[in-house]
Amino acid sequence: MMKTLIVLNGPMGVGKTTAGKELCRRLTPSIFLDGDWCWDLHPFSVTDATKALVMDNIRALLRRDLDCAEVDYVVFVWVLQQEETAAALLDGLDEKARILRITLDASDESLSRRVQKDIAAGLRAPDSLERSLAYQRFYPGQGTLHLSTDGRSPAELADEIAGLVRNRAES
C-alpha cells in the first residue's frame, strides 16, 4: 500500500489541529505533525533565516515520517496561505506518498467565535482574530479540496476525510 500524506490547511482557528488529531484515530497507523511546532520561536520572528529554518525542519520531519515503515498515514496541519509555500514543502514527496490537500473553511462569524474563544482561554494572541480573518481571502483560489467546518464537529470532519482517503486509495 502506498502511504498517504494528508495536508489540512486553512486559517487559524478553523479546526485543523482538532480535526487532524481525530483523523489520526481513524486512519492507523498514522502520525500527526503541526507546522506550528516548527515555528515556536521566542520571541516570534519572521525573517529569511527563520523561514528557511522552519521549512527545512518541516520537510525533514515529513520525509522521516513517510520513510518510517510503521506509518501509513501522515497528517500534516498548517496555515499554508501561500501556494508557493505548500509547493516548496511538498516538492518531491509525491514519490513517497499519495498527497491529499484539503482546505478547511469557515464563515467569518464561525471563525470569529472560535478564535475569540481561544483568545479568552489564553490559547491565542489578541491579534489572532484580525490575522485569521485576513487570511480567509487566500484560500478560495487554492487548488485543494475545500471542506466547510461550519456546524460540524471535528469527529464529523475526520469521518469525511477518512472516507475520502480510503476512496482515493481504492481508485
Regions found by a protein language model. Give the residues of each.
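Conserved phosphate-donor/acceptor-positioning beta-strand/loop module used by diverse small-molecule
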Residues: E95-V115
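Hydrophobic anchor at the beta1->P-loop junction of P-loop NTPases
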Residues: L8
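ATP-binding Walker
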Residues: V14
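Pre-Walker A (Motif I) flank of P-loop NTPase domains
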Residues: M2-L5, V71
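Glycine-rich phosphate-binding loop used to anchor ATP phosphates in small-molecule kinases
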Residues: L53-K96
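Small-molecule kinase domains that catalyze NTP-dependent phosphoryl transfer to phosphate-bearing small molecules
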Residues: K117-E160, R168
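P-loop (Walker A) phosphate-binding loop of NTP-binding proteins
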Residues: P11
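Conserved substrate/cofactor phosphate-moiety recognition/catalytic segment
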Residues: T17-R63
